[in-house]
């Protein structure tokens, strides 16, 4: 009977609260699969913003087997970005998200405020690199997400920014039972002025008593190759000053990492 009044198939026929304006604009306030279940002020405000302003539109590139928002693999971003039952997903926090396929043409990029390219596993074509280059030249926001050993196909895009991924993986002196490639990092002083959120993170990770750490199980270093006119602001730095870029060790659980400066580990 509900289908005669409203189509809730996209909501999985779950309980929702519908907000609707006179002009037909609609927004849903949902319940979530967590301990609190009910929406908080943040989720309600995000829903109301759909009536008051144009929401930031975030595109996730799905070409070349990149991490997708429509897939269900462990490596995909579908849960954190588009899951309607996850409170902190982008769609529940005031963002519009869209799957981006460059085969549809340049126009798909024109509608975006942010483009995320996350770990593609195949090379881009020359035409696609040109499309992404124009996107960067227009001053739009681009997020490149790579990790050790799988960043190769991001290199052409990094080159447009004058950057490159360093070979190897960041490690630090082993702490208790944790593997050496589990990097404990803190927010840099230069990053705290980016936004109020980064300022709060800086305070948490830099305080003298029991500082918190941002943990990354496997991270690659980034180096500047050339000046392409961008201002560079490092966001995170390793907490341990004895950390280095490891080029030899593969088994971080059963092996012990050792700095070998003779092969370029620094």
Where are the model-predicted features located?
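Acidic, S/T/G-rich, low-cysteine, solvent-exposed domains in lumenal/extracellular/periplasmic regions
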Residues: 78-266
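Hydrophobic targeting/anchoring helices
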Residues: 1-89
